[in-house]
């Protein structure tokens, strides 16, 4: 595992997020039928090896028509790996579209027909070399709701056992461990900007504080 002094140490005080069931009822109970859009037609604008783009014509709630151009994504999984000493596993990886090395939790896209948990186990092993004896599904993240179908399933993993990584020949990333408080501080200072990692950090903070509960399941490593 690569040693990384990414985070400056120091106190990080955060107020716990409200429990999910405390959201104002008006936000969830109001009928939304007056907001829906009806698809009239759909055509493929681009069909790539990984991503596809569609261009749809929709009927708006007021009867007018408009176009919706969006990316069709196979979905992905992100894993929050908890080490026995209380630290978490993270990665540093270059992301070409933004030209930066990013701090991220281990993640990867779903293969066709793949179960999200199986994908999480596979990605954790391939990218970090670790396996886990306990897993818990936390939730999901819709990454870019205005222009993409992508959904990222969020899992926690613990009971970690180290082993050799299984990176693809053309895959390059560093793995390191960090104290959660250092991760919180890095997020607060804007040093972590990856959306899935910010969402996972919110989950991590609330799970470790006891505000949010997980249903842990035993799995063979």
Identify the residue ranges that each predicted region occupies.
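Short, Lys/Arg-enriched N-terminal segments with co-localized hydrophobic residues
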Residues: 16-26
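Extreme N-terminal tail/first-helix region
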Residues: 26-47
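Acidic, metal-coordinating catalytic segment for phosphate/diphosphate chemistry
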Residues: 42-78, 84
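Unchanged
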Residues: 66, 75-78, 109-195, 215-221
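A glycine-rich, hydrophobic loop/mini-helix early in the fold
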Residues: 76-104
